[in-house]
Each structure stands twice: as C-alpha cells, then as structure tokens.
Amino acid sequence: MVLPQDLLSKSYTKPKVILCQTNKENICQLDATELSGTFKFNSYSEISFNVASVYQDLITGETKPTPYYDYIEGLRLVYLEGFGYFQLQNPELYSDGIKEYKSINAYSLEYVLSQRYLENFIINKGDVGDTIGSIDGVVLYNPNDSTHSLLHLVLQKAYGWTIGHVDDELANQSRSFEVDRESIYDFLMNEMCETFKCYIEFDTIN
C-alpha cells in the first residue's frame, strides 16, 4: 500500500470514505465516524469506522435516512481517499432502540487474493515420478510470453489485477514450485517473495 505523502504533515486532513461497487464504481460518500486504520507494508492493511442509519440535514435540521445504508455490506468496497480501496467485511449492527449504526471493518483490496486459490500449481518441476503437469521454462516475469511468466500464471485467477514494475535483475530468474492448494495471496507473499528475495507493493488505486 502506498501511503499519502502528507500523512504525517500539518496539511493532512481526514480522508473521504466513498462506498463503491465491487468494480470500483462509486455509489456515494459515507458520513464515517470513529475512522481509524492500521497500515502495513508486508501484509494487508485494515480500517474501521461507523455509519449511522440516519443523519441530520444541516440546512433543514431534519433527521433523514442515510442514503445507501443497506448497501453497506460485506464484499462491497470503500475508497479511502489517498490510501486506496478496501473490501468491506460483514458489518456489525448496533441499536439501542433509538439509534442504530453499523460498525465496519475493511481490508485493503489485496485481501481479495486470499479468497482466490492456486490448485495443482506446479512450476519448473518436470514431469518426473509423481510430478505430472509441470509448466517448465518459467521465469518470474516475461511480458512477451505470459504462458512462461510466473506472475502472469498466478494472476490468471485474480480478476482485475495487472502487473506493474518488476526489477530487471529479478525478471529472468527461475525457481521451482509445487502447490496442492494455496491462496494466491499466501503464495505471493510467502513462497514467491521468500524464494526470490523480493517484496510486492500493491497499488489498489491504479
């Protein structure tokens, strides 16, 4: 995750929280209260906030239903201005009979990769013994041959993600992998990063 450059400066202001569809289409800006976040470099980040079921119109003074309140549900996204997109988890509903609000946790968008899996994923093992179905001649990143590019092969099952920059000294390196079943996120962050001695920076905005 790329954090805003002014995060620790005096010019930093509270970011807008915008409710979005799963395709990142904006729905509306949320009146989020108790907004807080835990931002990490080597794992997905987390934010939390509350949204009340009603709000007070500043012009008329009337109490009105919060627009799209029912749309605040698990799997939809929010865009946290300057930070990126986050996937909503199922909110908790609180009510005292008079006031009602939803308490929401959301994880940075790369979290969705923990819900997609690689199965029988065998790379550079050769068809020897019990190892059948290996894709050989694979390097970390080959933009001219996606069938022999590890990053392309992994992201085939990760809709909406593309590959940005890969350091030249890493791109042509080759390693072997054999995965029975593992989430794409765990494979990327554990096996791949540890094996290639690299790190991944997820850009959820672009």
What does each of the following model-derived ranges do?
Residues M1-D70, N105-S114, E119, I123-Y141:
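Juxtamembrane "anchor/assembly" segments of surface/extracellular structural proteins
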Residues F41-S43, D96-I98, E194:
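Solvent-exposed loop and beta-edge segments used for protein-protein assembly and interaction
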Residues R76-Y107, E201-D203:
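Short beta-strand and beta-hairpin "edge-sheet" elements
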Residues Y101, Y107-N206:
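Charged- and aromatic-enriched interaction segments used to assemble
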